[in-house]
Regions:
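Short amphipathic alpha-helical segments at helix-loop
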Residues: 3-6, 102, 191, 195-198
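Solvent-exposed, polar/charged alpha-helical surfaces in well-ordered, non-transmembrane soluble domains
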Residues: 16-19, 23, 27, 58, ...
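Solvent-exposed, acidic/flexible segments
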Residues: 8-15, 50-54, 106-110, 114, ...
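Generic, ordered loop/turn and secondary-structure boundary motif
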Residues: 9, 61, 83, 129, ...
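Alpha-helical metal-binding/catalytic segments enriched in His/Glu/Asp
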Residues: 1-54, 210-213
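Metal-dependent peptidase/peptidase-like ectodomains
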Residues: 37, 47-184
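Sec-exported extracytoplasmic/periplasmic mature domains
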Residues: 20-30, 62-66, 118-126, 144-147, ...
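His/Asp/Glu-rich mid-to-C-terminal helical/loop segments that flank catalytic regions of hydrolases
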Residues: 40, 159-229
């Protein structure tokens, strides 16, 4: 049975953040010459049934594969839970993709997307951490079809280690470093996942990192060559 709760961080945060980016790009396209620099089309999607087994994204991929349109999609970026209260600036690590279920062609691009997100956080002088490419979110069906994927994740029921807390303390200060040996989102799948559960600082920077990556990829002259060398 799916859990019952407000779902503000999981996954209202990623849903709203993606919508904010889509609206901002829409304004840029209408009011500026932004389109002149775009080399790829963007499609913003919100999937249903993730908690019940990635139902929405799986159905989309199945239908797109059946009608031949799946080949139009070069990359999938996934933003699921990006405002956890005891957050990590988590980046999906392409190197941890399951080699038994992931086509080889998806790996170089997925690793490059990982580096792209790292680039943002290092430019902003922010800490970051690798997150496992577990397939538990809606990028999974795309990755399984050989499409390069990447994304951001501030954490769910994982624990923040002492090393992580100390590193965040050095870079962010005591107010933003969180607690060691504590769950990243103690309200994960619980009724307390309300607006008060959202870490606004983490959320802001995760949305900015998402926007940075989308903008970069959309403007690449040869996106497919970059993803699939």
């Amino acid at each position: 049975m799916p859990y019952v709760g407000p779902g503000i961080n999981d996954n209202g945060s990623g849903t709203a953040g993606t919508l904010a980016i889509a609206l901002h790009i829409s304004r840029l396209l209408r009011q500026t010459n932004y389109a002149e620099n775009m080399r790829s089309r963007l499609k913003f999607c919100w999937w249903g049934g993730e908690e019940m087994g990635l139902l929405g994204s799986t159905d989309f991929v199945r239908r797109a594969k059946a009608d031949g349109s799946l080949k139009k999609y070069s990359v999938n970026l996934n933003f699921d839970m990006i405002g956890s209260p005891n957050f990590l600036f988590g980046i999906y690590d392409g190197k941890t993709a399951d080699n038994t279920t992931t086509p080889v062609r998806a790996l170089p691009g997925s690793n490059r997307i990982t580096r792209l997100f790292i680039e943002y956080f290092e430019k902003q002088r922010l800490p970051w951490d690798y997150m496992g490419f577990s397939g538990r979110s809606d990028y999974g069906p795309f990755l399984a079809e050989g499409i390069a994927c990447g994304g951001l994740f501030t954490g769910a029921d994982e624990m923040k280690t002492q090393e992580q807390r100390d590193r965040y303390l050095r870079m962010l200060g005591p107010a933003l470093s969180g607690m060691a040996r504590a769950i990243l989102d103690p309200c994960y799948h619980r009724s307390c996942d309300t607006m008060e559960n959202l870490n606004q600082f983490a959320y802001l920077h995760m949305v900015k990192a998402a926007a940075y990556s989308i903008d970069y990829l959309a403007k690449l002259q040869n996106l497919n060559q970059w993803l699939y060398p």
